[in-house]
Amino acid sequence: MILYEYPFNERIRTLLRLEDLFDRLEYFLGQDHAQQHHVALTTLFEIIDVAGRADLKTDLIKELERQRQALAPLRANPQIDQDALDSVIGEIEQGIAMLNQTVGKAGQLLTDNEWLTSIRSRAIIPGGTCEFDLPAYYAWQHRPAEDRRADILKWARPLVSLRMGTTIVLRLLREAGQSGKVIATGGSYQQMLSGRSYQLMQVYLDDSLLAFIPEMSANKYMLWVRFTQQDGDLRPRSVDADIPFLLKLCNF
């Protein structure tokens, strides 16, 4: 199955972007080539930009605390797997503790690093990190892969709590959803929300339907899913076929 997700609000949109960036950072950090570590470092800069919202840490703590309070009464329910419940609550409490220990804005230690700041300011310029622009960075790229990886891990360490909080919140949100099989008649599907509010829409497509690309949108009254295909130049074109898919709407 191929999963497409659509956030209903800016907060979830930010968390999805952070999740994508953290995954990219982890992948390229696990490689050994200097160019791959360059991508890892520029991805770290992107994470700082996205996470720079002053209230992001507060939002995560509040949401985790709300989830902990919602789950705590279930400890009195004999039909609930208490070991699994304790594991989830323990993970939430660990996430809250780590976020509370984070001082200042996300990535503040990186922005205070003059050498990293110089690289960051040049990285936004096309071709701006050549050896004649940043000879010290060029020299760093010729260090052993293990040394470069250790440096990036050290620089990324202040963001570990942010990643953990993001991961927990998104996992809990994705698990709190209702799903059903629907059909996009003539390539289009719409559904009234009947006053209910959601935070995330998921569209699951069978692998055999890879050629069909869902374009999703929503407001507080209705959601739409419209499928397109790409022509030889990869430009989108409308679809007239009936397309089955699994729709899941998630909300805490």
UniProtKB/Swiss-Prot annotation:
The species this protein was found in:
Cupriavidus taiwanensis (strain DSM 17343 / BCRC 17206 / CCUG 44338 / CIP 107171 / LMG 19424 / R1)
Member of which family? Belongs to the ZapD family.
Q: Keywords for this entry?
A: Cell cycle, Cell division, Cytoplasm, Septation
The UniProt subunit note reads as follows: Interacts with FtsZ.
**Role this protein plays:** Cell division factor that enhances FtsZ-ring assembly. Directly interacts with FtsZ and promotes bundling of FtsZ protofilaments, with a reduction in FtsZ GTPase activity.
Q: Which InterPro entries match?
A: ZapD, ZapD_C, ZapD_sf
**Gene Ontology CC terms, in alphabetical order:** cell division site; cytoplasm
Would you tell me the protein name for this molecule?
Cell division protein ZapD
Q: What is its main location?
A: cytoplasm
Q: Where does it live in the cell? A: Cytoplasm
Q: Which GO terms describe its biological process?
A: division septum assembly; FtsZ-dependent cytokinesis
